[in-house]
């Protein structure tokens, strides 16, 4: 699973998720990409589940690029603990993904295989997505 090797601060502020992604809005490496159409935190487990779903469907053929990395820690308090007494312990790692960001890219497989692999990956993620091709940035929407 993806986790940072070393961080300066273990506990981070939550931050805001306003606006669109500043960069990473075009397909850069592969032929097909999975683009987020809404903003959300994506955990390292969700990224790994999507990666496994894609590679299994492609039968280890082609190449997959993961364009997001979970660099932000999130905390939670134990169940039954009252309010106050400081911030909770680090629980896991997330990648804040804004609207328009390309999360995964695929190359080296036929169009039908790429579309189905990205569709399967989109069901593992908590955001609405669309499948985009390298040339035209229109795309097929997956509201679900």
Swiss-Prot record:
For this record, the Gene Ontology CC terms, alphabetical, are: cytosolic large ribosomal subunit
Query: CDD domains of this UniProt entry?
Result: Ribosomal_L16_L10e
Encoding gene per record = rplP
Keyword Ribonucleoprotein in the entry? The reply is yes
**Among its keywords, does the record have Iron?**
no
Which PROSITE patterns does the UniProt record give?
A: RIBOSOMAL_L16_1 (PS00586), RIBOSOMAL_L16_2 (PS00701)
Q: Name one GO molecular function term.
A: rRNA binding
InterPro entries linked: Ribosomal_uL16, Ribosomal_uL16_bact-type, Ribosomal_uL16_CS, Ribosomal_uL16_dom, Ribosomal_uL16_sf
Q: What is a biological process (GO) this protein takes part in? A: translation
Q: Which UniProt keywords apply?
A: Ribonucleoprotein, Ribosomal protein, RNA-binding, rRNA-binding, tRNA-binding
Q: What is this protein called?
A: Large ribosomal subunit protein uL16
> What does it do?
Binds 23S rRNA and is also seen to make contacts with the A and possibly P site tRNAs.
Q: Which domain of life is it from?
A: Bacteria
The record's note on quaternary structure and interaction partners says: Part of the 50S ribosomal subunit.
- Family membership, please give it: Belongs to the universal ribosomal protein uL16 family.
Quote the Pfam families the UniProt record gives: Ribosomal_L16
Signal sequence, start to end: none
* SUPFAM superfamilies linked to this entry: Ribosomal protein L16p/L10e
């Amino acid at each position: 699973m993806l986790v940072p090797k070393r961080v300066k601060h273990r506990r981070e502020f939550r931050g805001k998720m306003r606006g669109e992604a500043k960069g990473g809005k075009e397909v850069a490496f592969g032929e097909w990409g999975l683009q987020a159409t809404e903003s959300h935190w994506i955990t390292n487990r969700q990224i790994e589940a999507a990666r496994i779903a894609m590679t299994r469907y492609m039968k280890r053929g082609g190449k997959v690029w993961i364009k997001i990395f979970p660099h932000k820690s999130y905390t939670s308090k134990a169940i039954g603990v009252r309010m106050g007494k400081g911030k909770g312990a680090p629980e896991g790692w997330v990648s804040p993904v804004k609207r328009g960001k390309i999360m995964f890219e695929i190359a080296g497989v036929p169009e039908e295989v790429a579309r189905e692999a990205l569709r399967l990956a989109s069901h593992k993620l908590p955001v609405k997505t669309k499948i985009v091709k390298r040339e035209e940035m229109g795309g097929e929407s997956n509201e679900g």
